[in-house]
Regions:
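Glycine-biased, small-residue-rich flexible motifs in mid-sequence functional cores and linkers
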Residues: 1-130
Length: 130
């Protein structure tokens, strides 16, 4: 999941992660919105949630998925609400850290500060998912 305003950094991380996951028996889930999520769809998400009520969709995704991976998100990003749903259900939230000067890194850096698991190397995440 991630920002609707995807950076080149976010695009690269998503591409690298999707490439690592393509031969694993892991279902990739996303929400149909622009930005990072549309890149996940383009690269092969297996399940796509849709609708206009993002609070309801976020709850459905949190019920369905085992973990949440957030690549980017700005201040006030909907990914913060989604992360809250996962945390409320006792599920792990993984975040890609970013530069503190980048608005698109605010949500991930803040969530890491609040206890989300930082993704320092993508290969380590794929080990956790097996």
């Amino acid at each position: 999941m991630g920002s609707r305003f995807m950076s080149e950094y976010g695009k690269r991380v998503i591409g690298d992660l999707m490439n690592l996951l393509k031969n694993k028996k892991i279902e990739v889930v996303t929400i149909r919105v622009s930005g990072c999520n549309s890149e996940v769809i383009r690269l092969g998400a297996q399940k796509i949630f849709e609708g206009d009520n993002f609070q309801k969709i976020n709850e459905e995704v949190a019920d369905y998925a085992d973990i949440l991976v957030i690549v980017e998100g700005g201040r006030g990003s909907g990914t913060l609400m989604l992360a809250s749903n996962f945390i409320d259900k006792g599920k792990n939230v993984y975040c890609v850290p970013g530069r503190i000067t980048d608005e698109g890194s605010y949500a991930t850096n803040w969530l890491i500060g609040e206890g989300a698991i930082p993704i320092i190397e993508l290969e380590n995440l794929t080990l956790v998912l097996q």
